[in-house]
Amino acid sequence: MTEGHPDKICDQISDTILDALLTEDPSSRVAAEVVVNTGLVLITGEVSTQAQTNLIDLARRKIAETGYTGEDSGFGANNCTVLIALDKQSPDIAQGVDTAQEQRQASSDERFDSIGAGDQGIMFGYACNEAPELMPLPISLSHRLARQLAVVRHNGQLDYLRPDGKTQVTIAYEDGKPVAIDTILISTQHKAAIGDISDDNAVQERIKSDLWEQVVLPVFSDLVIQPDSATRFLVNPTGKFVIGGPQGDAGLTGRKIIVDTYGGYSRHGGGAFSGKDPTKVDRSAAYACRYVAKNIVAAGLAEKCEVQLSYAIGVARPVSVLVETFGTGKVADEVLLDLVRKHFELHPAGIIEHFNLQRLPGERGGRFYQEVAAYGHFGRNDLDLPWEQTDKADTLRQEALATTQA
């Protein structure tokens, strides 16, 4: 899914707001929701911050960055109406986050028991060895295609493309292993005519040919698995995609949670990421789950690993921690669970500190969360993301080996 999809526009505006507020005030509490439609942007939610930021300017700049700069698309950075309707964070929620139950009841004086989870919920993280970045192959390829689609639009290589677009890859599996590319699907917004080509069928033929040469082939150039004569290649199957973006569909923050994660390959707790500061465990704990799962797979202790955490609002310690390797583990899941509890910090305050989640926007020039708001939060080798590090893999491997030898 490209950055010009209506829901992704909303995610990016929400995270641009989050970046700006955390840059100026790292303790900001943010739940920024955005709605877009033809000619309209609504910024709503709850924010408690000392930061002074022009949210309207932020929204317009992000919209322009995605490519909506003209007035002929029904949605442009300079001609859309931007409305703001924000409240402060509820004090009933804030009191549980500011001081966790463990400290309110004087049951713990541990440092990471100071901050409670910002909500209740279940979070999952996943990793597998299907792609170099330890992601499921279908979502990995889909993101690669979407990013390349944006590249050839931004650099003018295919100057008839417009910002909205989706990609999808269907993989054939045998015995749980990817063996073939079954279908590649690209839906991309485009101008009504390409040069002197105005016939709809001829336009689609040109787009299909260009996308194969300049999007698909470059994406697969360094991969072992390749499309072949049996692979179906579908482009704009309706026959036309001129009206797109917020003019074609309304957009809403947090509506593409499967695209943001693992493409449906693993379970999902239902919580979205964008617009949420890291005290919201929907976001920070999902990042921690990915970190744990990726280190287990990187250590060679499993071919597939799913990690589940759950939290209660206002409570610092996870309610549950589970590890599942789907029969691919080199040691028992119970051994892995013990290693996870020993080596990974899973309190909300600990996750925030370990990943530096409140200060990274300021340290990276005001751009951190918005960079993952499109093209996925996981497996991003193009970005330096703390939850994608595999710095604990060696320790896990050594201790797991010692356990089996004992």
UniProtKB/Swiss-Prot annotation:
Enzyme class, broadest EC rank: transferase
Role noted for this protein: Catalyzes the formation of S-adenosylmethionine (AdoMet) from methionine and ATP. The overall synthetic reaction is composed of two sequential steps, AdoMet formation and the subsequent tripolyphosphate hydrolysis which occurs prior to release of AdoMet from the enzyme.
GO biological process: one-carbon metabolic process; S-adenosylmethionine biosynthetic process
Keyword Nucleotide-binding among record annotations: yes
Localisation per UniProt entry: Cytoplasm
Entry keyword annotation includes NAD: no
Residue sites binding L-methionine per the record: 46, 89, 249, 280
Residues that coordinate or bind Mg(2+): 7
Enzyme Commission number(s): 2.5.1.6
Binding annotation for ATP: 5, 164-166, 240-241, 249, 255-256, 272, 276
Residues that bind K(+): 33
Record note on quaternary structure: Homotetramer; dimer of dimers.
Example of a GO MF term: magnesium ion binding
Stated family: Belongs to the AdoMet synthase family.
Keywords from the named record: ATP-binding, Cytoplasm, Magnesium, Metal-binding, Nucleotide-binding, One-carbon metabolism, Potassium, Transferase
Gene that this polypeptide is encoded by: metK
Biological pathway: Amino-acid biosynthesis; S-adenosyl-L-methionine biosynthesis; S-adenosyl-L-methionine from L-methionine: step 1/1
Protein name: S-adenosylmethionine synthase
Catalytic activity: L-methionine + ATP + H2O = S-adenosyl-L-methionine + phosphate + diphosphate
A cellular component annotation (GO) from this entry: cytoplasm
Stored Pfam families: S-AdoMet_synt_C, S-AdoMet_synt_M, S-AdoMet_synt_N
Ranges for region Flexible loop: 89-99
Reported cofactor(s): Mg(2+); K(+)
Cofactor binding note: Binds 2 divalent ions per subunit. Binds 1 potassium ion per subunit.
